[in-house]
């Protein structure tokens, strides 16, 4: 158990750590596909898109490490308002449908802006903000009105959905292993 945990932690550290470019490779100037030396920052040029970071996703009892664009996931095949709960309590969602719903929920969570815990300002700080100007306060209120409300009900609903999908996946794996066992014993 400890060995598996150490190996998993080591793999995650290697996969998620940012590697510095090798200077020997950077010195090769005209070699095709060779990385170039980092350029100094120029604030007049438009910012280039950042490379996507790997995302660790847990489905059932397995962990997947997704690299690249999360928008190109199986979630694109489903409509945005389909959930495993709308399919009915009696019918179990298929593995692909459960995975697609999980990716859809994950994408929704990633697209929500993160709020800081200390977003409330002290009364003295609020007075100082009012003294700075009403324009800045109006921009802040406008930005806040655009953010979707984050509620505990939504969080617990998503948690229940993910747990239900994990439970369904675990039951499917158990049924598959039971079928294999019965085939072996039946022979």
Swiss-Prot record:
Annotated Gene3D superfamilies: 6.10.250.1920
Annotated signal sequence range: 1-19
Designated name of the protein: Corticoliberin
UniProt xrefs under PROSITE patterns: CRF
Physiological role: Hormone regulating the release of corticotropin from pituitary gland. Induces NLRP6 in intestinal epithelial cells, hence may influence gut microbiota profile.
Subcellular location: Secreted
GO MF term set: corticotropin-releasing hormone receptor 1 binding; corticotropin-releasing hormone receptor 2 binding; hormone activity
GO biological process, alphabetically ordered: adrenal gland development; associative learning; cellular response to cocaine; cellular response to dexamethasone stimulus; diterpenoid metabolic process; female pregnancy; glucocorticoid biosynthetic process; hormone-mediated apoptotic signaling pathway
Higher taxonomy: Eukaryota, Metazoa, Chordata, Craniata, Vertebrata
UniProt similarity note: Belongs to the sauvagine/corticotropin-releasing factor/urotensin I family.
Principal location: secreted
Gene Ontology cellular component terms for the protein in this record: extracellular region; extracellular space; neuronal cell body; neuronal dense core vesicle lumen; perikaryon; synapse; varicosity
InterPro entries, per the entry: Corticotropin-releasing_fac_CS, CRF, Urocortin_CRF
